[in-house]
Amino acid sequence: KKIVSYSYPFNRSNQYTYFQPNFDQLNVSDFFLFRCDNFDTVFIAENNLAIFTSDPVECKHVFYFFSISGSNCGRFEVNSDSFHYQLKIDSEMTGGETIGGFIHQTEYSSEFLEKIPGIDSKQLIFQHRGYTGFRRKESSSSCFSFLHGNFGGMYIRKGKLLSISRQRSEHYYTPQIIIKIDKFYELFFLNPTSKMLIISIILVDKYNKSRTIGNSKISPFGSYKFELNTFSKSEIENISWKTNLPVGRAIVFENNGVLFDVFHT
């Protein structure tokens, strides 16, 4: 006997829609966070075709930067034939913006693509899920804390920013972390969609009582920083947020006044 019936709405999911580009070299990028405030930011950009062919390939890396309000605030490009290119992001690249998001795009010469057998440039899709590293400014350490890209699906077409990301039904997103005492948290939310995104942040105590501690509207392609100080707290709590993003992850910086950690939720 069938135990699960399709008549129940919670057994259904949104229908998958295949996206086929009609132009050459589609680049689908995650939405990455940059910080030029009291942190240094580096980005490890992949040269997809060099990795695919196991040989150095000349690649143009193009980076587009967006402010907290979602406006285009900077563009930087560089040519490299290395398998990976490390970019150190500074405020000159970001138009003076200290916090925001960015995407990564690549371009290859059509002459090179024609030499690779079996490749149709109109069916060639590059996915950029590179790694972003963070380190406190003027740190004596040469090490960065890295994490991969956040939910994106963004690309540039004829100079215009577009996205295949869509907002879905409102739901609660509960990460696998706890809010500890004696910490300072910075939660960064990025909106990879072309619509205004509403976020409500909720804390849940050990008695399972919840309270809303923050609400924000994030502009299309914008970002939002939420701060939470637990130095005066006496108990551990859980955190959730209400969102319309299918994958509503935040980027979290956890500080104790001396050390910090950065991770996805």
Segments from the language model and where they lie:
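Gly/Pro-rich, tryptophan- and cysteine-flecked surface segments typical
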Residues: K1-T265
